[in-house]
Amino acid sequence: MLKRTPLYDVYKEYGGKTIDFGGWELPVQFSSIKEEHEAVRTKAGLFDVSHMGEVEVSGKDALSFLQKMMTNDVADLKPGNALYTAMCYPDGGTVDDLLIYQKSESCYLLVINASNIEKDIAWLTEHTEGDVTLTNQSDGISLLAVQGPNAQSVLAKLTECDLSSLKPFTFIDKADVAGRQVLLSRTGYTGEDGFELYCRNEDAVHLFKEILAAGEHEGLVPCGLGARDTLRFEAKLALYGQELTKDITPIEAGIGFAVKHKKDSDFFGKSVLREQKEKGAPRKLVGLEMIEKGIPRHGYAVKKDGVPIGEVTTGTQSPTLKKNIGLALIKTEFSEVGTEVEVEIRKKTVKAKIVRTPFYKRPKQS
């Protein structure tokens, strides 16, 4: 039996087509992936991401515990701020990538990938020591994401909060939006400006409909997982299970900015990650652009002069660039921009070249 979010019945109202996504019945699209992608890049989109996991970590030893478990420097946080981090195994492989919100002096909210909830909680529990309490809140919290250049003007119609003063990776813990209390953060997974709203399950449908109504004249549309994937891919935002796995380190995956190997605390994977940061990693995540016809897909082999050098982690026809592009994890010595390589597509060898990433960067606000 597939799991469903509190918004399941609403999908049908708006024409949502659902798929099995890691055991969840979620909308892959409402209108079309291309239209939804375009709406988020130019106007706004609304996503149901309630399948994500939420774990509260509290207690006087919460900070020292998180410093031991996470690659980023959690001591940099203060209440009302969030950061992106990885959690690693001793060999540097990735347990998960996640967001940490500091709610108060000794209380943090971890937002983890849906497919990793049980694994992450088991890993955290195994290493808990001192005054630390872990509370799995995943089943009681729904999560909506409003993303795109018009996201702020849409939400401004529903709240008295001063959204313009909310900087990226900051949040308001008990914000009133459309008459409901939410944790409202300026975060997202699309490469655009945007907000995420963590709410009680019973408030999810009300908020979803209120946001859609508020965005009616702003070009906001409901969006599915298909557009979420093409948007994050163009912005080179890693997806666990593709760019990050237990066999791929955060350095290899290009998120070295979330690894603070000089922080005082020891953490899982520190020695391996420090060495990769200082001396370079054996593999590197690069951008591919096809020279010949063909779309690079997850798992396709990448070769240089017929010799395997890595594989594609994500690939598609980019809705924004109108090109066939991919991300690939390859041997570092072949990662220079401009290098020609081959991708094996349906037993045929197809030419591609290494290009700069991210493929898409949000235009600066004038």
Curated annotation (Swiss-Prot):
Q: Could you tell me the keywords of this UniProt record?
A: Aminotransferase, Transferase
Q: What is its EC number?
A: 2.1.2.10
Reactions listed under catalytic activity? N(6)-[(R)-S(8)-aminomethyldihydrolipoyl]-L-lysyl-[protein] + (6S)-5,6,7,8-tetrahydrofolate = N(6)-[(R)-dihydrolipoyl]-L-lysyl-[protein] + (6R)-5,10-methylene-5,6,7,8-tetrahydrofolate + NH4(+)
Q: What's an example GO BP annotation here?
A: glycine decarboxylation via glycine cleavage system
GO molecular function, one example? transaminase activity
Top-rank taxon: Bacteria
GO CC annotation terms, alphabetical: cytosol; glycine cleavage complex
Using the UniProt record, name the top-level EC class of this enzyme in a single word. transferase
Entry's family note: Belongs to the GcvT family.
Instruction: Report the function annotation for this chain.
Output: The glycine cleavage system catalyzes the degradation of glycine.
**Name under which the protein is recorded:** Aminomethyltransferase
Q: Organism classification, top ranks?
A: Bacteria, Bacillati, Bacillota, Bacilli, Bacillales
Encoded by which gene?
A: gcvT
